[in-house]
């Protein structure tokens, strides 16, 4: 796993709220992950202007919130190219019915912002492979899912966890197609 760590959801939520930014941690991570998966390079600082335009009417962010966004960007960049294929989604945690509804909403928001990030990065989705198009269609369908108050909440919580795992797989498929690949070592191997 990467040395780069994601910020804690509650602390980041407070930071974004105190900065009066109209985005929550799940949305921010989804947006940045979508941008990376769409081909954004870490060397390309244009992501900041795109995020400012998308979230804050083009106005810059306070230094602390911007540093947290960069922390997410670095962590997700490392996770997306890691050979362990492990992604950590920045989602709220908690117990009980209310927490389950909050999690389901955050999952939908994460997906919607991921798809927006793909678009902001300029990914050419029209020329995507069949696998990438299927992954995108799956994400679009999963973004519409919700929790039914009248069904068994424990069962729905389990299904939501399966959805989250499928989201990760879809993200990896899209990043494999459009994302910037890690630089290959060009030095010859000495035996």
UniProtKB/Swiss-Prot annotation:
Q: What is this protein called?
A: UPF0149 protein VC0395_A2053/VC395_2591
Q: Which PANTHER family match?
A: UPF0149 PROTEIN YGFB
Biological source species: Vibrio cholerae serotype O1 (strain ATCC 39541 / Classical Ogawa 395 / O395)
Pfam families according to UniProt: UPF0149 (PF03695)
Which residues are connected by disulfide bridges in this protein?
none
- Entry GO terms, CC: cytosol
Please give the family membership noted in the entry: Belongs to the UPF0149 family.
């Amino acid at each position: 796993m990467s040395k780069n760590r994601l910020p804690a959801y509650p602390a980041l939520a407070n930071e974004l709220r105190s900065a009066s930014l109209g985005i929550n941690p799940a949305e921010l991570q989804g947006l940045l992950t979508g941008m990376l998966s769409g081909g954004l390079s870490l060397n390309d600082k244009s992501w900041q202007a795109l995020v400012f335009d998308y979230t804050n009417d083009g106005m810059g962010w306070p230094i602390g919130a911007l540093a947290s966004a960069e922390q997410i960007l670095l962590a997700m960049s490392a996770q997306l190219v890691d050979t362990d294929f492990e992604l950590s989604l920045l989602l709220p945690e908690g117990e009980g019915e209310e927490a389950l509804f909050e999690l389901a909403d955050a999952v939908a928001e994460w997906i919607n912002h991921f798809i927006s990030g793909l678009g902001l990065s300029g990914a050419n989705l029209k020329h995507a492979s069949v696998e990438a198009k299927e992954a995108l269609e799956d994400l679009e369908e999963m973004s519409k899912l919700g929790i039914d108050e009248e069904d068994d909440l424990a069962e729905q919580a389990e299904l939501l966890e399966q959805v989250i795992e499928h989201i990760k797989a879809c993200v990896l498929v899209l990043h494999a197609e459009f994302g910037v690949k890690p630089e290959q070592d060009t030095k010859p191997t000495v035996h």
